């Protein structure tokens, strides 16, 4: 961990001037780069802050219901939402401008950036979606006694193969997490195999299944229509169902 922090800091300090010069010549900077450095103005959030992080669009959308339910359940707490991409920021503002108390970028995983971020946000608890594992951030959360959770955790097969090569490194990282909550039993086993403590790793349902689906094309008034639902059909069964539906439609015109 110490080696990681030293090397990442050196690499960051060496590359930052070069990056800034190139971007200045092009007149275009990485979206949110100042915020990621810890240079942002945050409102006075107090000492009751729940922080959610989703790196981009998919993760942010998956967090929607949980964030809104958290706000309803804990109205005395401030909600902070962070993302790692511009598109993530856009969807976060679209979804949570009336729910979150502050929306910003997640910091670079460099000591000074993480320290500035945590000082300004002062979270009481941090919940990070899916597979965002940041060693320095996790270490500072533990140092400051901030509970840190992975929620909706998942690891793809390709990521699992890569992480397995340095599972000793990840074993150290997971010591800083309070709990790992995964999407499935398979994901749970993957997390454990790359170093997550079994006693800290549990299965939760996939948050994406909780996302509200709005049917804009059909409004069904209960009790006035005959409705046939065909789910999980196999090859050859669709034709049989459609044939039966056509026969019913002739006899009962309100069949849908």
Predicted regions mapped to residue ranges:
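Membrane-interacting alpha-helical segments
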Residues: 3-7, 11-18, 22
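Absolute protein N-terminus
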Residues: 1-2, 166
């Amino acid at each position: 961990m110490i080696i990681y922090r030293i090397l990442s800091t050196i690499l960051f300090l060496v590359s930052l001037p070069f990056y800034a010069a190139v971007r200045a010549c092009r007149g275009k900077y990485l979206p949110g780069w100042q915020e990621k450095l810890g240079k942002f103005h945050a409102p006075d959030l107090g000492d009751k802050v729940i922080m959610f992080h989703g790196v981009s669009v998919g993760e942010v959308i998956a967090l929607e219901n949980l964030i809104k339910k958290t706000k309803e359940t804990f109205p005395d707490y401030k909600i902070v939402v962070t993302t790692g991409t511009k598109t993530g920021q856009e969807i976060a503002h679209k979804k949570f401008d009336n729910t979150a108390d502050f929306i910003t970028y997640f910091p670079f995983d460099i000591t000074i950036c993480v320290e500035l971020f945590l000082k300004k946000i002062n979270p009481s608890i941090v919940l990070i979606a899916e597979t965002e594992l940041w060693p320095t951030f996790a270490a500072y959360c533990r140092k400051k006694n901030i509970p840190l959770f992975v929620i909706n955790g998942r690891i793809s097969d390709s990521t699992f193969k890569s992480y397995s090569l340095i599972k000793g490194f990840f074993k150290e990282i997971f010591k800083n997490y309070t709990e790992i909550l995964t999407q499935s039993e398979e994901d749970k086993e993957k997390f454990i195999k790359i170093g997550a403590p079994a006693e800290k790793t549990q299965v939760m349902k996939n948050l994406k299944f909780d996302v509200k689906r709005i049917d804009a094309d059909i409004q069904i008034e209960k009790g006035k229509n005959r409705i046939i639902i065909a789910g999980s059909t196999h090859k050859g069964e669709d034709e049989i169902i459609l044939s039966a539906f056509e026969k019913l439609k002739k006899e009962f015109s309100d069949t849908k």
